[in-house]
Amino acid sequence: MRKPIVVVGSINLDLVATADHVPLPGETITGRDFNTFNGGKGANQAVGVGRLGYPVSMVGKVGEDSFGAALKNGLRKAGVDVKAVQAVKGSSGVALINIGSDGQNNIVVVPGANGKMLPKDIARHAVLLRKAGMLLAQLEIPLITLETLGVFAHRHGIPLMLDPAPARELPAGLMQVITWITPNESETRILCGLDTQEPVTPATAARCADLLLARGPKNVLIKMGAQGVFLAAADGVRQMVPAFPVKAVDSTAAGDAFNAGFAVSLLSGKKPHEAAHYASAAAAISVTRKGAQPSMPSAREVAAFLKAQK
């Protein structure tokens, strides 16, 4: 029996405006379209895992508002176990997303109920968490709760994959209990102290991966958009895994699709570079579709995509 993936993280409603380009600071532009989608990095990754047919549970919170029930139901429909998703007083989390015609985006997240994920919630769901084959987490819930989760994972020998988004510095204690850390380019710049405009090349990624490994994580995956992914694994592997060339429509959930695909493939027995290849396919499919959770591919779609590349 496969041990489930358990995602501890955010559940949001995404409010998405599309325009010819992402507005610059102080700029007001006319948009072309507006949609709402279920989102939140935690929920996105849980849905990504569920769509790939792997057992997955979500630990998180929604508000007692008009969004909460719909957010929970969206998870359930994707095959996610939602017994550990709690409704609390106040608003659900929301994300305000602007998307340009090139697929690039900027995002403002208002935590809402996600801000009420507390350290005691880790203890409350300890039985579920102990059953996990891997724990997936992000930075859209309080940092102190993530530190508690990290200690729990380390104590029980459960691999912890951390997606360090939204970008910020991380405490040493948390870094030392991470099994996989998966920053994108902007997060890599912050974690490695690079200039905000410095391009993240394969050489830069290799240097940053070594810096991150020295701080405690056992493995590093640096997500570099169209360039691909730089992998620095505990088994000594250091390599670029190229991305698949596709026309991007919406890159909002590309990183979430990647993390979901990587976790599923790794727990299915693949080696890290093989799992990164599979995850890159999942991410490539996701950017060709609008919306966060709606963009997550099924296992059949990923298999067909990979077959078409041969």
Q: What is each stretch, according to the model?
A:
Residues M1-K3, R168-G173, P199-K310:
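Conserved phosphate-binding/catalytic region of the ribokinase-like
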Residues M1-K61, S66-A70, K77, K247-V249:
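Glycine-rich phosphate/adenosyl-contacting loop at the front of the ribokinase-like
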Residues G74-K89:
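A glycine-rich helix N-cap at a beta->alpha junction
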Residues G79, G115-K120, L160-A167:
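Short gly/ser/thr-rich secondary-structure transition/capping motifs
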Residues A87, I97-M134, L139:
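Conserved phosphate-binding/catalytic loop of the ribokinase/pfkB sugar-kinase fold
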Residues M134-R207, Q227-V229:
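Conserved beta-alpha-beta core of the PfkB/ribokinase-like small-molecule kinase fold
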